[in-house]
């Protein structure tokens, strides 16, 4: 298996998980709209809407982290970074992943696992509603999200190593984009295909 295939495989996993949990937005919208209707029109509020909102939002926030990382979409202060040559960018990012990213993610997995196990052992429920909605399932998502982030972090480190060796950042999987960005991707692909066709040894 090539490095590029491995990178795309990890990216695809993060993408699939991110897309799956994106449906939480639809459920949140429908649930919140229903709560507003029954509360203010029928004067009959639900006992579960608040718990549903923070559980689904928490799950969405946690499980979309690896997807955002695979898209290089996390917020960064790149005013100086983008001016650096690719190899310098790769070295800097590799150092930051080793000394800052992975210690934080490992702490998230370790602490999140203990937190989730304690919650599951006592059968923790929400104190915000009279029906006692179970919330230990949400806390199990914390170490799972950390594991996905760690896996995607490995892919990003491999990208850094490839960039240091070749002087170019490896391509990422294309996904839903704004039209302008999609056009830029298409132009880059056409340029890359034209470059490959012009390599020595090709039949003309």
Where are these regions (language model features)?
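Alpha-helical transmembrane segments and membrane-interface helix-loop junctions
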Residues: 1-204
């Amino acid at each position: 298996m090539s490095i590029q295939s491995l990178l795309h495989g990890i990216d695809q996993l993060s993408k699939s998980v991110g897309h799956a949990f994106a449906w939480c937005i639809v459920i949140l919208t429908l649930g919140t709209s229903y709560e507003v209707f029954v509360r203010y029109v029928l004067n009959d509020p639900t006992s579960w809407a608040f718990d549903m909102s923070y559980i689904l939002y928490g799950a969405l926030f946690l499980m979309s982290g690896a997807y955002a990382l695979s898209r290089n979409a996390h917020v960064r202060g790149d005013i100086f970074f983008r001016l650096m040559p690719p190899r310098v960018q790769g070295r800097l990012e590799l150092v930051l992943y080793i000394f800052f990213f992975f210690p934080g993610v490992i702490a998230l997995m370790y602490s999140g696992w203990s937190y989730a196990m304690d919650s599951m052992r006592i059968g923790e429920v929400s104190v915000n509603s009279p029906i006692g909605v179970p919330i230990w399932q949400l806390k199990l998502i914390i170490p799972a999200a950390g594991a996905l982030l760690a896996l995607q972090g490995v892919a990003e480190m491999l990208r850094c190593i490839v960039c240091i060796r070749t002087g170019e950042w490896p391509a990422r999987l294309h996904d839903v984009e704004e039209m302008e960005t999609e056009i830029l991707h298409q132009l880059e692909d056409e340029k890359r295909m034209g470059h490959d066709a012009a390599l020595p040894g090709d039949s003309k």
